[in-house]
Swiss-Prot record:
Assembly and binders: Part of the 30S ribosomal subunit. Contacts proteins S5 and S12.
The protein's role, per its UniProt record: One of the primary rRNA binding proteins, it binds directly to 16S rRNA central domain where it helps coordinate assembly of the platform of the 30S subunit.
Keywords: Ribonucleoprotein, Ribosomal protein, RNA-binding, rRNA-binding
SUPFAM superfamilies: Ribosomal protein S8 (SSF56047)
Organism: Lactobacillus gasseri (strain ATCC 33323 / DSM 20243 / BCRC 14619 / CIP 102991 / JCM 1131 / KCTC 3163 / NCIMB 11718 / NCTC 13722 / AM63)
A biological process from GO: translation
PROSITE patterns in the cross-refs: RIBOSOMAL_S8 (PS00053)
Name of the protein this chain belongs to: Small ribosomal subunit protein uS8
GO annotation, cellular component aspect: ribonucleoprotein complex; ribosome
Transmembrane segments: none
Domain of life: Bacteria
Gene: rpsH
HAMAP family named in the record: Ribosomal_uS8_B
């Protein structure tokens, strides 16, 4: 089966595992997914991730994070720029997610970064997803 949007699949697997309160989820690896996982870890949305090499594509194992009363840390994930309709923004028009409570993940010439980092570097790019 050909996958038309691997980033949407990545976000959906995390969303589904989070809703089912799983402790971890395995996702086929790619450099973009590693960058997204690093951002989610740095922003505190996941506990950790590890890349497992299987001499093919490899897998990323993401360890989900929950609060002290087992409440979800990730409230929502939304894919913004899709293969059929790309969404690009300039540095002046970078989005704010829930007035700064969430993050927008942007693919820029400086790499895959959050909206906050993009504002600091004054760069625009493709809006990959919102996480809150």
């Amino acid at each position: 089966m050909v996958m038309t949007d691997p980033i949407a699949d990545y976000l959906t697997r995390i969303r589904n595992a989070n809703m089912a309160k799983h402790s971890s989820v395995e996702i086929p690896a790619s450099s973009m997914k590693k960058s997204l996982s690093e951002i989610l870890k740095n922003e505190g949305f996941i506990r950790d991730y590890q890349v497992e090499d299987d001499n093919k594509q490899g897998m990323i194992k993401i360890f989900l994070k929950y609060g002290p009363n087992n409440e979800r840390v990730i409230s929502g994930l939304k894919r913004i720029s899709k293969p059929g309709l790309r969404n690009y923004v300039s540095a002046e028009n970078l989005p704010k997610v829930l007035n700064g409570l969430g993050i927008a993940i942007i693919s820029t010439s400086a790499g895959v970064i959050t909206d906050k980092e993009a504002r600091e570097k004054n760069v625009g790019g493709e809006v990959i997803a919102y996480v809150w």
